[in-house]
C-alpha cells in the first residue's frame, strides 16, 4: 500500500475520525472524503491564519479490504504516528496525546519541543564555525546556567515540596537511581570503553549531576507522572549542592584533584540561588512571574544553546580527533542503559511503582543536567573535560524525547515500520 499526501502544517490537535463508513462503500472504485478539523487549543494563535484548519484526504477504493491510515504531526511538537485497530476498522488518533493535553499546552511546551532541534543545530554550528560560540567565556557561562535554573524556580511553589512527604517511596527510588546507580554506571562504561584521561573526569562528572529540566517535558509527552518529574528534578538539582561534589571527589579524585568545597559553592551560586529566587517570586510576586513565564522558556533555550556551543567550539580540534569521535559510542551506551536502568529499578519487587512513575524515573535517570556538568568541568577540571558534557546534552535530548514519543504513542515499532513497506492493497490516497 502506498499513501501519497501533500500536507500543509496541520493544527496541534486532530479530532478522532472513524473510517468505518468507508467499508460500506460499493466495491467498485469510488471516492470517500474525510475532513479532520482542529479542536480549540491555547496554541492556535501560534499558527498562521493562512494555514488550513483541516486536512482533507480522498481515499479511492478499488478492492475489498482494510485501509491502514497514518497520521503524522508536522507541528513544532514531536511528530506522532498512530495506528489503531478497532472492530476491524482503522482510526486516526488525535495528536499530542489528546485534547486534555492540548488544552494544557503553553509556550513552555512549544520551546521545549524545539529544544532538540536547537541542540542539534548548535552542535553543527559550533563544530563547523567555532567563532559562532567561542565568544561565550566562562564569565558568561555561569549566568547562562543561572537563567536555566531560574526558569525551573519560577515553576515551583512551597506546596510542591510537600508532595515529597506524601510520596517518599517514588522520590527515594528516583534519588537512588540518580545518585547511586547512574554514577556507578558511568564508571563502568568509562572503564569498559577505555575512555582517555582527556575526557574521563568530565564524563564521570556528567554522570554525577541532577536530572535535566527537559525530562519534565519528556514526561508529559510519554504520559508519565509530570508532577513527580518536576518534584524529582527540582529536588535532585537542589541536592546536587552536596551530592555532586561528594561523588566527584570519590570517583575521580584519584584521577584529577577535585576541590569539593569550591565546587559546592559554585553549585550553590548557579543552582540554588536562582531556584530559590524563582520560588520566592512565585510565592510572593505573582505579577512578576506572570510577566516572566512566557519568556523564560525561550531564555532557557538560548542559555542551553550557549552552554553547549561554548565547549564544543573551544575544543573543536579535540572533538573531531580520533579520541573525540570515540566519545560517541560510550555516551550513547551510557544514556541508553541509564534509561533502561531507571525504568527496571523502579519495577523491583518491594519498590515496584506504577507505570507512569516508572517512566518518569527512567527519563529523569537518562536525562541529566549536562549543562551544569559542563560549567563545573570548565571551572575545576579544564576546558577539554567539558566536552563529554556538551556531547551528552545532544545525545540525551534526542534519545530522551524519542523514547518519550514512543511511550506517548503506545504503539509497537514494528507497526510503524510495516507502514513504510509498500503493499498491494488496491487503495490509493489523494490529497
Curated annotation (Swiss-Prot):
Transmembrane segments: 110-130, 145-165, 169-189, 198-218, 238-258, 261-281, 288-308, 325-345, 387-407
Superkingdom of the organism of origin: Eukaryota
Name the UniProt record assigns to this protein: Probable sodium/metabolite cotransporter BASS3, chloroplastic
UniProt record similarity statement: Belongs to the bile acid:sodium symporter (BASS) (TC 2.A.28) family.
Membrane topology of this protein: Multi-pass membrane protein
Keyword Transferase: no
PANTHER family, sorted: SODIUM-BILE ACID COTRANSPORTER, SODIUM_METABOLITE COTRANSPORTER BASS3, CHLOROPLASTIC-RELATED
Organism: Arabidopsis thaliana (Mouse-ear cress)
Disulfide bonds, paired cysteine numbers: none
Cellular compartments annotated: Membrane; Plastid, Chloroplast envelope
Transit peptide, from-to: 1-70
Chief subcellular location: membrane
InterPro entries assigned: BilAc:Na_symport/Acr3, Bilac:Na_transpt, Na+/solute_symporter_sf
Function, in words: May function as sodium-coupled metabolite transporter across the chloroplast envelope.
Any single Gene Ontology cellular-component annotation: chloroplast envelope
Keyword annotations of the record: Chloroplast, Membrane, Plastid, Transit peptide, Transmembrane, Transmembrane helix, Transport
